[in-house]
């Protein structure tokens, strides 16, 4: 009888520990994003939008093929959506759409950011400019990270603006000869929420950015303009801060989502992931893109504290499962607007959708 009693105590303690661990994880994550089926997809390709390409000097239907992978921010009580748009030749440019309610958007007629006859054309043509992520800087301007694609090599680049009309392209984030011609993508800057604004946050005297599209790495800067890759001092190779996991939904690759959010619990990063062809999550089709979350130490941004064991969003709608690339939910846009978090994501590399959470992270 005594042995049974002791066993019961052990089982109960184990259950309590498990519950405490689950509650601890719930305390730092974004929870319960609900897809807005009544409105989705909120943006779709449109052949009626024309733009005179400065490279070819010919009119192009700049968003006729696909719209996808948006970033978002709040300005003057409205939600601004910067989204990737592709023409029939698959060249990418960035369009702008504005919304009063965060759901229904009005597109601007012409792209606001695109390849031009400038010193960065060698990086951006003919593939274009892809997958934007935007944050506010402490001086109230905006920092945009994006992927330039010359048709062979993708490079993580950045630009700055004060008015979203006049942009100053700054070139590749990683300027050193060691990295400038290597493949890099997807820069998510660490920010702190001030009201509805997401402002780049200094930690230990540096700004930080997560990047990569296989594993995650980091770059740092003292001024948001000059960036250095975080390297191992001994091996001189990039410090790997997040990797795929065999047997999981994120077994093939991991890639940053929107900005990384500085909170009391730590730095919360939503990340995109892909399911491998084998040694994967067998409940999902191979190569499925879904999104999950990881927590880093708020004082040591490369130190992982926790990581969710499953995705919080994955393709289960027709427009997410069938498109330019099947089985894709790719998260890049996040705003805090009217007391709720609104998440914007690309669907099957073809359209854009929205999900909403009331969680007060």
Model-identified regions with their sequence ranges:
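Sec-dependent N-terminal signal peptides
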Residues: 4-13
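Beta-rich carbohydrate-recognition and catalytic domains
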Residues: 15-127, 135-252, 261-324, 338-361
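C-terminal structured domain segments
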Residues: 324-327, 331
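Glycine-rich phosphate/diphosphate-binding loops that line cofactor/substrate pockets in enzymes
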Residues: 335
